[in-house]
Amino acid sequence: MINDLISDGLTRIRNASMRRLDTTKLLHSNVVEATLKILANKSYIESYNVVEEGNKKFINVVLKYDERGRSVINELKRVSKPGRRVYQGRDEIKRFKNGYGTIIVSTSKGVLSNDEAHKAGVGGEVLCTVW
């Protein structure tokens, strides 16, 4: 049984992009789906769709590569973990990697990117960073 579906999903995406695979399959959870929605909106992945196989849900993720065949994701890192939670207040959420990166935050208003959380004036648990 996998305890941390977010870490598992990020690791599967990272491994698939290193192997230059077109798609990868993740276990479904609402937080993972919200994280993928942000990654798709920020153009880190092409797309994703939820599929149901039997009584289990999975998410198929289509990865994105540049014209040279390199992954557009340089680094995908889990920040807050089950054993060590990391929280940032609304004043601590700032630009990441000079605006080229994204911080994904779980807030009281849902899972948001650092830009959205800053505009909404909320802080929360830092799930991961992407650039």
Swiss-Prot record:
One of its GO terms (cellular component) is ribonucleoprotein complex. HAMAP family: Ribosomal_uS8_B (MF_01302_B). NCBIfam families: PRK00136.1 (NF001109). Keywords: Ribonucleoprotein, Ribosomal protein, RNA-binding, rRNA-binding. GO terms for molecular function: rRNA binding; structural constituent of ribosome. It comes from Campylobacter fetus subsp. fetus (strain 82-40). Pfam families: Ribosomal_S8. PANTHER family: 40S RIBOSOMAL PROTEIN S15A. The gene is rpsH. Belongs to the universal ribosomal protein uS8 family. Part of the 30S ribosomal subunit. Contacts proteins S5 and S12. The keyword Ribonucleoprotein applies. One of the primary rRNA binding proteins, it binds directly to 16S rRNA central domain where it helps coordinate assembly of the platform of the 30S subunit. GO terms for biological process: translation. This is Small ribosomal subunit protein uS8.
